[in-house]
């Protein structure tokens, strides 16, 4: 059998802080780790503000993003929390999916109310499919006027409702700074916020519960046994003797049966999301399958050539293009394991797209790719990444 699995006793949830610059996202992240450390010292280590603020650089689909990860636990759950300090970092994270969120804490300063970036972050959260948002009304210690607090709360609820988020979501009045300083009233406010996070953010759908999908990375023949495809299982579970479909790149898809699952040269009964496996396929020749295709539960994923995407185009400083692009731009779109050339149509009224922009585009690929809404891709020119995006709507 394969190695012992990492045992998690609690549900694992990915969350993040979003909101306007200087409204206190990073301070709140530090306050949460401190308050939970003090409340459950055996479960949590404390993290200083500057450890979180000096966010390390990460590369995701060829794009550099500054992003901080902290972990903490409540009695109920284990959380991984991401904080992207800069506005551009947040946008890049959301579009490239460097850190996906099961829910978000929208930080709004009670002293300012919602600001332009607050709206933009909520809109992006909607577009990239963040399932739930609740609100931390930060700097509430600095506002004495109850009516003003209620007004800001109402504005925030209207903003959530406008993007079809739950307008009855918890809005918790906090002071991250005072909580960090240990003021008991405001420490309690952060505890209340985390209770609200525990209660209101739904348990995520586990990847293993979704229909099976594995992108093909490599194909080879084992003499006397047949053709093996290797890759990392993206979602779901595959059992020996189950039927699968090979989809994408070719004009038609092929059905076959998995006669063996291998991991670390050991035979398994099943492979599941996250495993790097080899699948032995019945009656399939080496030339019947290629990198860039996906192996899926039959009928669950279809190949498409036309879609609308939401994209971020790298600036020159990030190693992107030095010049804008126009209608009929023809880069490669890198989906999962392979590049496919596509022709870009810009939205009505957009003449060109500048390096550093984020925009929506329509794309027509020269080969079909197995895709669902939300699938991420990189935009490349001769192997160099010039942008990243996600499928927002499948056209054909």
Swiss-Prot record:
<dbReference type="GO" id="GO:0005525">
    <property type="term" value="F:GTP binding"/>
</dbReference>
<dbReference type="Pfam" id="PF03143">
    <property type="entry name" value="GTP_EFTU_D3"/>
</dbReference>
<keyword id="KW-0378">Hydrolase</keyword>
<feature type="region of interest" description="G4">
    <location>
        <begin position="138"/>
        <end position="141"/>
    </location>
</feature>
<dbReference type="InterPro" id="IPR005225">
    <property type="entry name" value="Small_GTP-bd"/>
</dbReference>
<keyword id="KW-0547">Nucleotide-binding</keyword>
<dbReference type="GO" id="GO:0003746">
    <property type="term" value="F:translation elongation factor activity"/>
</dbReference>
<keyword id="KW-0251">Elongation factor</keyword>
<keyword id="KW-0460">Magnesium</keyword>
<dbReference type="InterPro" id="IPR031157">
    <property type="entry name" value="G_TR_CS"/>
</dbReference>
<feature type="binding site">
    <location>
        <begin position="19"/>
        <end position="26"/>
    </location>
    <ligand>
        <name>GTP</name>
    </ligand>
</feature>
<dbReference type="InterPro" id="IPR004541">
    <property type="entry name" value="Transl_elong_EFTu/EF1A_bac/org"/>
</dbReference>
<feature type="binding site">
    <location>
        <begin position="83"/>
        <end position="87"/>
    </location>
    <ligand>
        <name>GTP</name>
    </ligand>
</feature>
<dbReference type="InterPro" id="IPR009001">
    <property type="entry name" value="Transl_elong_EF1A/Init_IF2_C"/>
</dbReference>
<comment type="function">
    <text>GTP hydrolase that promotes the GTP-dependent binding of aminoacyl-tRNA to the A-site of ribosomes during protein biosynthesis.</text>
</comment>
<feature type="region of interest" description="G2">
    <location>
        <begin position="62"/>
        <end position="66"/>
    </location>
</feature>
<feature type="region of interest" description="G3">
    <location>
        <begin position="83"/>
        <end position="86"/>
    </location>
</feature>
<feature type="region of interest" description="G5">
    <location>
        <begin position="175"/>
        <end position="177"/>
    </location>
</feature>
<comment type="subunit">
    <text>Monomer.</text>
</comment>
<dbReference type="GO" id="GO:0003924">
    <property type="term" value="F:GTPase activity"/>
</dbReference>
<keyword id="KW-0342">GTP-binding</keyword>
<dbReference type="InterPro" id="IPR009000">
    <property type="entry name" value="Transl_B-barrel_sf"/>
</dbReference>
<keyword id="KW-0479">Metal-binding</keyword>
<feature type="domain" description="tr-type G">
    <location>
        <begin position="10"/>
        <end position="205"/>
    </location>
</feature>
<dbReference type="InterPro" id="IPR027417">
    <property type="entry name" value="P-loop_NTPase"/>
</dbReference>
<dbReference type="InterPro" id="IPR004160">
    <property type="entry name" value="Transl_elong_EFTu/EF1A_C"/>
</dbReference>
<dbReference type="Pfam" id="PF00009">
    <property type="entry name" value="GTP_EFTU"/>
</dbReference>
<dbReference type="InterPro" id="IPR050055">
    <property type="entry name" value="EF-Tu_GTPase"/>
</dbReference>
<dbReference type="InterPro" id="IPR033720">
    <property type="entry name" value="EFTU_2"/>
</dbReference>
<dbReference type="InterPro" id="IPR000795">
    <property type="entry name" value="T_Tr_GTP-bd_dom"/>
</dbReference>
<keyword id="KW-0648">Protein biosynthesis</keyword>
<dbReference type="InterPro" id="IPR004161">
    <property type="entry name" value="EFTu-like_2"/>
</dbReference>
<dbReference type="Pfam" id="PF03144">
    <property type="entry name" value="GTP_EFTU_D2"/>
</dbReference>
<feature type="binding site">
    <location>
        <position position="26"/>
    </location>
    <ligand>
        <name>Mg(2+)</name>
    </ligand>
</feature>
<comment type="similarity">
    <text>Belongs to the TRAFAC class translation factor GTPase superfamily. Classic translation factor GTPase family. EF-Tu/EF-1A subfamily.</text>
</comment>
<protein>
    <recommendedName>
        <fullName>Elongation factor Tu</fullName>
        <ecNumber>3.6.5.3</ecNumber>
    </recommendedName>
</protein>
<keyword id="KW-0963">Cytoplasm</keyword>
<dbReference type="GO" id="GO:0005829">
    <property type="term" value="C:cytosol"/>
</dbReference>
<feature type="region of interest" description="G1">
    <location>
        <begin position="19"/>
        <end position="26"/>
    </location>
</feature>
<feature type="binding site">
    <location>
        <begin position="138"/>
        <end position="141"/>
    </location>
    <ligand>
        <name>GTP</name>
    </ligand>
</feature>
<dbReference type="InterPro" id="IPR041709">
    <property type="entry name" value="EF-Tu_GTP-bd"/>
</dbReference>
């Amino acid at each position: 059998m394969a190695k012992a699995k990492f045992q998690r006793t609690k549900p694992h949830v990915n969350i993040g802080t979003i909101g306007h610059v200087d409204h206190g996202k990073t301070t709140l992240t530090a306050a949460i780790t401190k308050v939970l450390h003090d409340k459950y010292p055996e479960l949590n280590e404390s993290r200083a503000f500057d450890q979180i603020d000096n966010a390390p650089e990460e590369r995701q689909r060829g794009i550099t993003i500054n992003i901080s990860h902290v972990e903490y636990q409540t009695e109920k759950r284990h959380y991984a929390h991401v904080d992207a300090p800069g506005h551009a970092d947040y946008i890049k994270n959301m579009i490239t999916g460097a850190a996906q969120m099961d829910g978000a804490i929208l930080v709004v300063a009670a002293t300012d109310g919602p600001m332009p970036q607050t709206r933009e972050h909520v809109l992006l959260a909607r577009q990239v499919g963040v399932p739930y948002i609740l609100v931390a009304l930060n700097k509430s210690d600095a506002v004495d006027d109850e009516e003003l607090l209620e007004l800001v709360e109402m504005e925030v609820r209207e903003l959530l409702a406008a993007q079809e988020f739950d307008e009855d979501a918890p809005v918790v009045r906090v002071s991250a700074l005072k909580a960090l300083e240990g003021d008991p009233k405001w420490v309690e406010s952060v505890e209340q916020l985390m209770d609200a996070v525990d209660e209101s953010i739904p348990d995520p759908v586990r990847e293993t519960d979704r229909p099976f999908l594995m992108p093909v990375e490599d194909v080879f023949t084992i003499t006397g046994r047949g053709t093996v495809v290797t890759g990392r299982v993206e979602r779901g579970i595959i059992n020996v003797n189950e039927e699968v479909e090979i989809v994408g790149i070719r004009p038609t898809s092929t059905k076959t049966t998995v006669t063996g699952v291998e991991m670390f040269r050991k035979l398994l009964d099943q492979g599941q999301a996250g495993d790097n496996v080899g699948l032995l396929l019945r009656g399939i020749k080496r030339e019947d399958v290629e990198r860039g295709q996906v192996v899926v539960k039959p009928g669950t994923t279809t190949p498409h050539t036309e879609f609308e995407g939401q994209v971020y185009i790298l600036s020159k400083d990030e190693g992107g293009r030095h010049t804008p692009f126009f209608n009929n731009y023809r880069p490669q779109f890198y989906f999962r394991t392979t590049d496919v050339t596509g022709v870009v149509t810009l939205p009505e009224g957009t003449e060109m797209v500048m390096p550093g922009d984020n925009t929506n585009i329509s794309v027509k690929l020269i080969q079909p790719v197995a895709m669902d809404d939300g699938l991420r891709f990189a935009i490349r020119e001769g192997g160099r990444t010039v942008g990243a995006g996600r499928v927002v709507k499948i056209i054909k």
